Amino acid sequence: MSNKKIEQWEIERYWEIFASLSNGQPRLNNSQAASVLRNSRLRDEQLEKVWDLADVDGDGELDFEEFCVAMRLVFDLVNGELQSVPQHLPDWLVPESKAHLVQATRVLSTGSEQFERIEDEDDTPGLKDGFDWYMNPSDKAKYEEIYSANKNQRGEISFGSLQPLYDSLDVPDTDIRSAWNLVNPSASPEINKDATLAFLHILNYRHEGYRIPRTIPASLRASFENNKIDYQVDNARPAQRWGPNGDTETPTGRKAKFGDTYLSRLGVGGKASYTPKGTDFNNTIQDEEWEKVRLRRELAELEAKLDSAKKASEGRRDQPRNDGRPSWVLVKKEALQLLDYKERELRELREGTGRSKDGQDLERIREDIRTVGEQVDGLKSHLARRNEYLHDLRRQVEEEKLSR
């Protein structure tokens, strides 16, 4: 697996750009993102391909995770890390919350048929439209718990195995069966993990008063019908550097109650068995002074350890240090140097100087060259005049000698 990843400082920088463009909204549309993307001077067809790759959920907009993907692709193209836009999103760039969509899209690209229209008669008055297939990290973690508690040896779920969950929900039996049929187009007695997560997601939204969707995206259906997907974390974890911590707040208080009673009965409530690891977008710091604060906190911890070490070493100061333990004075000195370095980097970032500048403006360089050229010409003219003056002085000296 590639060792490449999006560094934390990149995420913080991308957040500053995203926040300045989004006006407080969770997503950017094409026109909002166009200004910063076109500053890269990439061709329009390249930017279109970057957009298509980054828009993982295909909603025509970029949320923050997708924006990070787009920015990293653009920078890699500009810096020569990539010679062309890749055909598929690299595994290390796939956001954890959308890994199932990317995996399903890849399955679909091998030739799976398009999604079919699934008819239902869910026209119950009072239900809301606006169902969203996107699973936020906290909801997905809860679905994972329910799946893990009920899966059989083949990693599949039967309809009847979730009956206690159905009993705890405010969802009619007809709607539950409609959701099951939606994710189980082949009418199998059991469904795989992807289908189970989608099934629970539909029930969650229906529990909150949203109308059950009539169709299912082609990419999702392809993943439902593919029984060879490997879900072992050690074998396939395409988004290991993007894992959120599962603490994201849900949009409404009612949604947070989905499955809680059921999970409490199982003894796993609040303890998600699925814990993705990697970059935590929910902890992205928006304050540019964050780095200084964090380093000062680390320095305080080091000083506390230093004081403790000094107290423990009282009475043994004259003994030779042959135990290989670190010198806390040196550690403190290095930490202070690191703090000074980080503060200087932050200052350069704010002022747009130092290594933070990608290069001098070409036009300004040309102007400097012209100025230097003019100065050289002026110096040459001045030298010629001084040589003429010197020659004249020598002539006068010779004439004076002859006159004597």
From Swiss-Prot:
Residues 279-381 form a coiled coil. SUPFAM superfamilies: EF-hand. Ca(2+) binds at residues 55, 57, 59, 61, 66. One of its GO terms (molecular function) is actin binding. InterPro entries: EF-hand-dom_pair, EF_Hand_1_Ca_BS, EF_hand_dom, EH_dom, End3. It is a peripheral membrane protein. It is found in: Cell membrane; Endosome membrane; Cytoplasm, Cytoskeleton, Actin patch. CDD domains: EH. Residues 237-256, 307-326 are annotated as: Disordered. Residues 42-77 form the EF-hand domain. One of its GO terms (cellular component) is actin cortical patch. The keyword Coiled coil applies. Residues 10-100, 139-227 form the EH domain. Disulfide bonds: none annotated. One of its GO terms (biological process) is endosomal transport. Residues 307-324 have a biased composition (Basic and acidic residues). The keyword Transport does not apply. Keywords: Actin-binding, Calcium, Cell membrane, Coiled coil, Cytoplasm, Cytoskeleton, Endocytosis, Endosome, Membrane, Metal-binding, Repeat. PROSITE patterns: EF_HAND_1, EF_HAND_2, EH. Pfam families: EH, End3. Component of the PAN1 actin cytoskeleton-regulatory complex. Component of the PAN1 actin cytoskeleton-regulatory complex required for the internalization of endosomes during actin-coupled endocytosis. The complex links the site of endocytosis to the cell membrane-associated actin cytoskeleton. Mediates uptake of external molecules and vacuolar degradation of plasma membrane proteins. Plays a role in the proper organization of the cell membrane-associated actin cytoskeleton and promotes its destabilization. Belongs to the END3 family. This is Actin cytoskeleton-regulatory complex protein end3. It comes from Aspergillus terreus (strain NIH 2624 / FGSC A1156).
